Amino acid sequence: MVWQDFMFACSVYELTPEFEANIRQEFIDNIKRLRHHASLALWCGNNEMEMFVKQGTWVTKPTEMRDYLFMYERIIPEVLSEYDPDTFYWPASPSSGGSFDEPNDPNRGDVHYWEVWHGNKPFSEYRKYFFRYASEFGFQSFPSVKTLETVTDDPKELNPFSYVMEKHQRNYGGNGKIAKYMQ
């Protein structure tokens, strides 16, 4: 089953008339392109935006919360009702159903749980929770040797703290964190 996100994540957008026309057309194009796939179970408005907008992490203008609600709780449902009314729509992930109502509530909707990776908790921490639906969680790993061989042929560069490995790591301190957990 496919949980299909619209391509919005980790940011806020100013909803100008031009931007609205642009995203409406993008929604229509993608809905028409994907709606007939038998595995499509759900459309999701965005990734992690409801949670961070509610927390005030990204909001810099008072209109951004209004624009958020308009985009994900009015425009997308409106377009879906015309082009794919039979596929379920979820406004964000994580969410408890929208309107900034406790977006990461473990008892309603879906949850993103990153306390092991970002919070340096032990793996046993996962056993403490019984989320209704954990749609995102995880722990980073080192790439396979086969993948690493596409960027270096020097065996010394396969060390997690080598120049090549550090330059390909996109999470500050990530290689050290992985090594610590491996001890």
Regions found by a protein language model. Name each.
Residues E78-S81, G97-F100, E115-Q183:
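Substrate-binding clefts and catalytic carboxylate motifs of secreted carbohydrate-active enzymes
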Residues N22-I23, K61-M65, R108-V111, A134, ...:
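Short, low-complexity, polar/charged sequence segments that are solvent-exposed and flexible
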Residues M1-C10, E20-L42, Q169-Q183:
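Active-site-adjacent substrate/metal-binding segments within catalytic domains
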